[in-house]
């Protein structure tokens, strides 16, 4: 019987990075405070001491340089893991990620690849202003050549991260801060992967498909299995990968239920929820029994302190949308 460990999301992530560094000498890791301090959330705690400063090191506050160094290192044969402290700090790095990391394979006609992982803590959970609480997955998700991942539980966090390490192409790895230490889960202690691009069917039902990912999954699972949405025939899907997203799983579910609700913390306009609904409407219109709906964050700058509650607390609106769709 395989050995298992109890881990929360931050511990599962640290375990994955430890295994990656141990198995492959080409893996390197760096970021602001990622070395000596073990990262702002302590995801990399102890790794510099174990693997040395040549493989795990600290960087200045220079996200563009961090990403650019990673691109060059990846082209040169290393597998860099770059920690951006918060996803909102990644704006200076976008030029390097979008125009170089994502395009190297195409630009070189396959001669070079860019196996870089850019880690980005995202979303609410610490009641911090603006850049500390951004939800930017739609921006990264539309960039050809990038894979964009967002796990919601320790098992997927470890498995998806190790799959990202194996990817020959760049992966943006979003980490919901509010779930870092929200709960523990029994996961394999050994190396394993979860396929990038494959959604997870959490619950089966015949009345309504709910598609979500990342920080909203914890509350949705509790609502479906023991709360206000219990016994309502909900088919709950954890997307896990934003790009490429698993159309097949979502489409098969909507064909069965005829109803769709997409739930995300991100803003409503020009985001992932709209892409999913547009795709379903374009390709499955004849299957729909009701107009698809979405529950999202507001189209505003993330507010400070207690204001975060009004941006990211979606449960009452989820219940209202479900009742409307099931009328």
UniProtKB/Swiss-Prot annotation:
The UniProt catalytic activity note for this protein reads: N(6)-[(R)-lipoyl]-L-lysyl-[protein] + pyruvate + H(+) = N(6)-[(R)-S(8)-acetyldihydrolipoyl]-L-lysyl-[protein] + CO2
Identify the GO cellular component terms for this protein.
Answer: attachment organelle membrane; cell surface; cytosol; external side of plasma membrane; membrane
Q: Name one molecular function that GO assigns to this entry.
A: fibronectin binding
Organism (species): Mycoplasma pneumoniae (strain ATCC 29342 / M129 / Subtype 1)
The record's annotation in SUPFAM superfamilies points to:
Thiamin diphosphate-binding fold (THDP-binding) (SSF52518), TK C-terminal domain-like (SSF52922)
Q: Where does thiamine diphosphate bind?
A: 63
Protein origin, superkingdom: Bacteria
* Role, per record: The pyruvate dehydrogenase complex catalyzes the overall conversion of pyruvate to acetyl-CoA and CO(2). It contains multiple copies of three enzymatic components: pyruvate dehydrogenase (E1), dihydrolipoamide acetyltransferase (E2) and lipoamide dehydrogenase (E3).
Q: Which gene encodes it?
A: pdhB
**Obligatory cofactor(s):** thiamine diphosphate
EC identifiers of the protein? 1.2.4.1
Alphabetic keyword roster: Oxidoreductase, Pyruvate, Thiamine pyrophosphate
**Keyword Hydrolase belongs to the record:** no
Q: How does it assemble?
A: Heterodimer of an alpha and a beta chain.
Q: Which PANTHER family match?
A: PYRUVATE DEHYDROGENASE E1 COMPONENT BETA SUBUNIT (PTHR43257), PYRUVATE DEHYDROGENASE E1 COMPONENT SUBUNIT BETA (PTHR43257:SF2)
What GO terms in the biological process aspect are recorded for it? plasminogen activation; positive regulation of fibrinolysis
Q: What is this protein called?
A: Pyruvate dehydrogenase E1 component subunit beta
């Amino acid at each position: 019987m395989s050995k298992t460990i109890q881990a929360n999301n931050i511990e599962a992530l640290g375990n994955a990075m430890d295994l990656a560094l141990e198995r492959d000498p080409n893996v390197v890791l760096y970021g602001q405070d990622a070395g000596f301090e073990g990262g702002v959330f302590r995801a990399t705690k102890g790794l510099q001491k174990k693997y040395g400063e040549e493989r795990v090191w600290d960087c200045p506050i220079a996200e563009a340089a961090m990403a650019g160094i990673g691109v060059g290192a990846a082209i040169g044969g290393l597998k860099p893991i770059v920690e951006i402290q918060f996803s909102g700090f990644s704006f200076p790095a976008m030029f390097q990620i979008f125009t170089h990391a994502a395009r190297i394979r195409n630009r070189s006609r396959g001669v070079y690849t860019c196996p870089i992982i850019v880690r980005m803590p995202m979303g609410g959970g610490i009641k911090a202003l603006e850049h500390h609480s951004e939800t930017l997955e739609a921006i990264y998700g539309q960039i050809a050549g990038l894979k964009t991942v967002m796990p919601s539980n320790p098992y997927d966090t470890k498995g998806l991260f190790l799959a990202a390490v194996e990817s020959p192409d760049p992966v943006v790895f979003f980490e919901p801060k509010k779930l870092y230490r929200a709960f523990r889960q029994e996961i394999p202690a050994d190396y394993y992967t979860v396929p990038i691009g494959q959604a997870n069917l959490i619950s089966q039902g015949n009345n309504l498909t709910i598609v979500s990912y990342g920080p909203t999954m914890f509350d949705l699972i509790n609502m479906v299995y023991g709360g206000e949405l219990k016994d309502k025939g909900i088919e709950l899907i954890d997307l896990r990968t934003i790009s490429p997203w698993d159309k097949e799983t979502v489409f098969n579910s909507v064909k069965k239920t005829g109803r769709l609700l997409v739930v995300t913390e991100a803003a409503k306009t020009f985001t992932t929820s709209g892409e999913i609904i547009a795709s379903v409407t374009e390709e499955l219109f004849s299957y729909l029994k009701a107009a698809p709906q979405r529950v999202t964050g507001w189209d505003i700058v993330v507010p400070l302190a207690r204001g975060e509650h009004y941006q990211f607390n979606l449960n009452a609106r989820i219940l209202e949308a479900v009742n409307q769709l099931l009328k």
